[in-house]
């Protein structure tokens, strides 16, 4: 099994991005699966262009995109990506699309095809906080998740794809009082646990357990 893992470069005034720093620490194989990690720019269309190149060349069995969600307290596999860009801030090249479809020929939304409930359970078993997230936002993270599912559907129809948000690193919250953070080793360990679940559930259905929200 081959798994492509992506991480964004820093954005929004941050000097580092825990997504990129964490995936650099991943081992070459996890639970027998070959791991390839790539850096993607926090730029709407360019992120998808880079991803497409690697999907076509690597032909992964699964794609796991990782992104920073400052303020979240744990690792959060995303349930759904919507076909809409609505950027509160510009991306790293100044693009700020508002109410713009990501793909004119795409579905209104794509659900993650990764075993998100099993991923949460595996992260919990590693002793780390995690939960299913029901919104990936409307910035580049949602954009890339949507593009990943669209591109996999087009170029690797048997592959799975999805996205997971992670908290700030400790170094990022020194000047952000009362903001949740996690040390880099734990973030990496949580990503490894999630990937272990992706491999473990490659030929079976996801766990059926509560992961919803009331609001």
Swiss-Prot record:
Catalytic residue positions: 78, 141, 165
An MF annotation (GO) of this entry: pyroglutamyl-peptidase activity
Subcellular location(s) of the protein: Cytoplasm
Enzyme class: hydrolase
PROSITE patterns (UniProt xref): PYRASE_CYS, PYRASE_GLU
Highest taxon of source: Bacteria
GO annotations of cellular component type: cytosol
Spans traversing the lipid bilayer: none
Pfam family, one: Peptidase_C15
Keywords noted in UniProt: Cytoplasm, Hydrolase, Protease, Thiol protease
Job of this protein: Removes 5-oxoproline from various penultimate amino acid residues except L-proline.
Sequence similarity: Belongs to the peptidase C15 family.
UniProt xrefs under HAMAP family: Pyrrolid_peptidase
Assembly mode: Homotetramer.
Protein name from the UniProt record: Pyrrolidone-carboxylate peptidase
Source organism (scientific name): Streptococcus pyogenes serotype M12 (strain MGAS2096)
Gene behind this protein: pcp
